[in-house]
Amino acid sequence: MLGRLYIQNFFFIRDVEVEFERGLNVITGETGTGKSMTISAIEFLMGKQGDYPEGTAVELELLGEEEIILRREVKKGRSRYYVNGKGASKSTVLELLEGKISLQGQNEFINLFREDFQRKLLDTFANLNDKVKELEKVYNSLRKKEQELFEFLRKKEELIQKKDYLEFRVREVEEIGISSEEYEELKNKANLINNLEKVKKAVGESLYKLLEGENSVYEILGEIRKNLAKVESYSGKFSELIEKIANLEEEVYELYNSLKEEMPEISEEEVNEINEKLFRIQRLEEKYKKSFPEILKEVEEIKEELSNLNSVDFKEEELREEVEKLREEYDKLAEEVSRDRRKKAEDLEERIEEILKELNLERAKLKVEIKESEPTKYGKDKIEFLFSSYGKDFKPLEEVASGGELSRLFLALSLILPASETYVFDEVDAGISGETSFKVAKFLKELSKKMQVIVITHSAPLCAAGDKNFKTEKKFLGDIPYIVVRELSEEEKVEEVARLMGMKSEKTLEGAKELVEAFK
């Protein structure tokens, strides 16, 4: 349960500390004194976003098996969270608060009219939230797979439409019959052809000087070797030199043969063939504004695309099977959820009827209407809460429920959800008075024996029923207003009950005392 609540620099609240207790804690005050700011401060601690002033801080003491102090503050424009004085994440704080506080502010009334809120409330009551999350997961997977199939079929259609063109692109390149490596060789041959006479002259002259002509390198080496052979006997060094010269002769001869092989011998037919291929390649390069190697790479990609096209039927069948499997899984889960909703809807109607009777709506009934709808991530049900003050002529809440009826219905719906350790209600008694107000107070008093209840109210009976009472007041520091929250003594509580009854007089004070006594 909640213990101490400390609020600092929270809008008009400068420095307030409130100590809640077990039972029914009641906060009252004149209109405009910021009664709901206590709720807003707790919402701030629970992570509510907003434009909060620098230095804002809210600290809350949770009492249970162990004492936990949670804090959120704004420093340098950023929110910081703490658990027992140590820095913590927002998610850690929210996890610690989970199941501890059920906060029902005035704005929650509006949610009663929303179909998604009504659906979520029924699912929570029916303990279906986990199954609905699973359903949502399957639904999202189904939609994703359906989109994948749609995109696949669209691309398949595009491929089929341009298949002839793609095949032509491949054919016009393959008819040339040149690979990337062969293209480089072809360019080298073309370069050779363009410089054929120059190459022939250079090779011919080299062959002549190496071996074929007079005074060739080969001939000169032979003469040198023969001359040295004549004087070989005069020095051992000559034998070594003669051997080296002989080796040189052999190398020159090998060089001659190698060079002779490089003498270009290209037929006119081969020249024409090379020029024809280069001409066709040049036309392709001009046509596609790309180099031939780039065109070859693109053709390989086109081949891959065509290969994929040939296997699309298998892929399509595979995708359709996956879609059908997910659809069957979704349908099965959706049917289970729908069945459980319809079953639990009756229990919800009965439970709400019981609570409404305790709140002085003897003949009022809630009807949970469930109709089949188009599939959504929440299933195939359209859920709407219908209400009747007299047990017939059910209509949507916004059409028939008065403010007082809505307040009590909201209270009843809040209480059928999984129990929290602390319930916080803001103006839950709006629009009710007289005997009904007394019954609501009595109901909350009984509820507070099981769990802690904090309520902000204008109701005299609720104020009288409080185990601990607080009052908000507006003060001024010069021209600057600020809000204080102070605990009321027993005497002050009676005076506050009298004020809420309409006026302070001996008669109302006496009535206030009797009302307070009625709840003891």
Curated annotation (Swiss-Prot):
One GO cellular component this record assigns the protein to is: bacterial nucleoid
InterPro entries from the UniProt entry: DNA_recomb/repair_RecN, P-loop_NTPase, Rad50/SbcC_AAA
Q: Gene3D superfamilies attached here?
A: P-loop containing nucleotide triphosphate hydrolases
Q: Which UniProt keywords apply?
A: ATP-binding, DNA damage, DNA repair, Nucleotide-binding
Q: Name one GO molecular function term.
A: ATP hydrolysis activity
Give GO BP annotations, semicolon-separated.
Answer: DNA recombination; double-strand break repair; SOS response
Binding residues for ATP: G29, E30, T31, G32, T33, G34, K35, S36
Please name one Pfam family that this protein belongs to: AAA_23
Which SUPFAM superfamilies is this protein grouped with?
A: P-loop containing nucleoside triphosphate hydrolases
- What does this gene product do? May be involved in recombinational repair of damaged DNA.
Q: Which family does it belong to?
A: Belongs to the RecN family.
What name goes with this protein? DNA repair protein RecN
Its organism's taxonomic lineage begins at: Bacteria, Pseudomonadati, Aquificota, Aquificia, Aquificales
